[in-house]
Amino acid sequence: MRIGLFVPCYVDAFEPEVGIATLELLERFGLSVEYPYDQTCCGQPMTNTGCHQEAAATEALFVKNFSGFDYVVAPSGSCVHQVREHLTAIPQTDEVKAVRAKTFELVEFLHDVLKIEELPWAEFPHKVAYHSNCNALRGIGHARPTELNRPFFSKPLNLLKKVKGLEVVDLTRPDECCGFGGTFSVFEPAVSAKMGYDKVTDQARAGAEYVVSADSSCLMHQKGCAERLGVPLRYIHIAQVLNGAAA
């Protein structure tokens, strides 16, 4: 199975260790993983600010880079949701449709495609709060949101249960947005910060040592809020935990 690895802009710039952990984790399962070196943005910032047509060049490059792979995998529900649902600034050829359909977020790829049953190398003896990032939760179906009042499931929590020593703590409002929202945090900084403070306070109240999520952007926002509040929480991407990160 030939995998194309897409690394989001903010991971490449601020948390390259998340991209490395994703690569290493996929290779643990015997997959052939390649990183196209001329990859850039998925186009989400332009789409989110109402300048969707300006994303055409980045969309075309994305398709060019990844059309030859069996699957495209990225450690970001936000970027994958953009590709699946909003990569529409370019003509929808069969090639474009195929790339959109085979683009997966890391957790769903491990859970739904590889159907991982065990992670024998993974051990993380800590109390963990899991943050369900909005686009992964409601956009690509990571889990069933509690507001639907239907039987619950969670792909990331199913995977975290396979990590030795890891204990998941219960949050008061587990599905609530952290306030980042990409450009939302720029246009509505006060609201964004307040939402982040509420999230961090809930995590601390639950007794978490670490906060785990499948999206680095949410983690970076919450980490900043925790530092501003003086709350000693630590934040780590799920790719690192599943890959056997030593805390």
Predicted features by range, described:
Residues M1-A247:
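Iron-sulfur cluster-binding electron-transfer modules in prokaryotic oxidoreductases
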